[in-house]
């Protein structure tokens, strides 16, 4: 079953946020990385920050293949004058498990992603169980 990003929550209407999740779900990791500014940062859970489009694309190709993300809720706040911040909550699914997650996404004034910070919203015991799953890397 294919669900478009917009079908999940019509209040989520920022095109760059839409494209980030849509391209990620299509496993189009180069296009996903190209939504970031040249020095944009991806901060995955339990990992060091990945900086730059090329490094982000390489990381996603290695770690996100087969994952689907389902954003459900978004809250927008103004950062300083240089960025807008979006807090998105939803799910990450693989063939083997699903977890609740949140994405903190900052867009600069030219509508490029400058930061995506991903957090898993699960209990420690649930995360430890996933750690032993062969397809989950933390």
Predicted regions and their residues:
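Hydrophobic pocket/interface hotspot
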Residues: 20, 32-33, 40, 52, ...
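Short, low-complexity N-terminal intrinsically disordered segments enriched in polar/charged residues
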Residues: 1-26, 30, 34, 134-138
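Generic alpha-helical structural signal
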Residues: 14, 18, 54-57, 61
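A beta-strand edge to alpha-helix "cap/lid" segment located at domain peripheries
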Residues: 2-4, 57, 61-138
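A short gly/proline-enriched turn/hairpin at secondary-structure junctions
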Residues: 41-51, 66
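Short hydrophobic/aromatic segments of transmembrane alpha-helices and their interfaces
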Residues: 38-39, 96
């Amino acid at each position: 079953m294919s669900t478009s990003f917009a079908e999940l929550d019509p209040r989520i209407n920022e095109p760059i946020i839409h494209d980030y999740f849509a391209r990620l779900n299509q496993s189009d990791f180069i296009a996903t990385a190209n939504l970031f500014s040249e020095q944009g940062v991806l901060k995955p859970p339990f990992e060091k920050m990945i900086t730059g489009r090329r490094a982000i694309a390489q990381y996603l190709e290695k770690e996100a293949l087969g994952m689907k993300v389902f954003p459900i809720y978004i809250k927008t706040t103004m950062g300083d004058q240089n960025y807008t911040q979006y807090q998105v909550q939803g799910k990450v699914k693989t063939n083997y498990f699903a977890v609740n997650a949140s994405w903190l996404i900052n867009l600069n004034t030219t509508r490029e992603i400058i930061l995506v910070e991903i957090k898993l919203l699960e209990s420690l015991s649930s995360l430890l169980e996933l750690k032993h799953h062969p397809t989950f890397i933390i």
